């Protein structure tokens, strides 16, 4: 990646919330009811930190109903059922999960850290906790000649779950990526 990951301090988050409250009041004059945490996948943060962020959001925006953000399947797996339920109660809802595919062959090759069964299990846990979610599907990730197989595997998994929506993005291969090297070596075809 062209940047390194770092967590924002709670002081920075509070400063952002103060500024957002000031601007929202000036621009809209309406109560803000939804926010979306940005910057990679904030759901990777520990439960306690997510709860503190929710508390701060509700302090500055008392009418806040939902808090969304990007998440990975592995982030969900790191949280207990009780924590997921508490996060739901704190307003977390409408996560955007980059599942990319439910094609196990592609998931293994891309070293995503999860398989189709994990998508089913972890999103089922979100369903039980009352946390809604949407998916990003990545066309092309299954490789040359495997697009239909990847789409069918993904549809089979997605149809067992309850995503609010499924968005499709195209695979982009960067020259400094591991996938680009695999293509150069002849191990994967676009």
Predicted features and spans:
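Short linear capping/connector segments at secondary-structure termini
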Residues: 34-40, 138-141, 184
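Active-site mouth loops of central-metabolism enzymes
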Residues: 7-9, 70-77, 142-149
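Conserved SAM/AdoMet-binding glycine-rich loop
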Residues: 22-132
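Aromatic/hydrophobic pocket-lining residues that form the small-molecule binding cavity
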Residues: 13, 17, 50, 80, ...
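Conserved C-terminal portion of the radical SAM core fold
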Residues: 94, 117-178
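C-terminal accessory regions of radical SAM enzymes
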Residues: 179-190
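Short glycine-enriched, charge-decorated loop/helix-capping segments at active-site entrances
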Residues: 2-4, 109-114, 186-188
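Canonical Radical SAM [4Fe-4S] cluster-binding loop centered on the CxxxCxxC motif
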Residues: 1-15, 19
């Amino acid at each position: 990646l062209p940047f390194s990951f770092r967590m924002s301090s709670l002081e920075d988050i509070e400063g952002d919330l103060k500024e957002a409250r000031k601007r929202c009041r000036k621009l809209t004059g309406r109560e803000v009811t939804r926010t979306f945490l940005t910057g990679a996948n904030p759901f990777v943060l520990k439960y306690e930190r997510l709860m503190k962020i929710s508390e701060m959001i509700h302090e500055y925006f008392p009418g806040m109903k939902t808090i969304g953000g990007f998440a990975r399947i592995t982030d969900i797996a790191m949280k207990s059922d009780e924590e997921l339920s508490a996060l739901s109660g704190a307003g977390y809802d409408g996560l955007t999960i980059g599942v990319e595919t439910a094609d196990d062959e592609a998931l293994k090759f891309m070293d995503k850290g999860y398989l189709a069964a994990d998508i089913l299990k972890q999103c089922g846990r979100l369903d039980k906790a009352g946390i809604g979610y949407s998916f990003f599907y990545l066309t092309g990730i299954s490789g040359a000649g495997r697009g239909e197989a990847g789409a069918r595997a993904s549809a089979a998994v997605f149809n067992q779950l309850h995503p609010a929506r499924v968005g499709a993005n195209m695979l982009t291969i960067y020259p400094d990526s591991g996938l680009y090297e695999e293509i150069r070596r002849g191990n994967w075809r676009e």
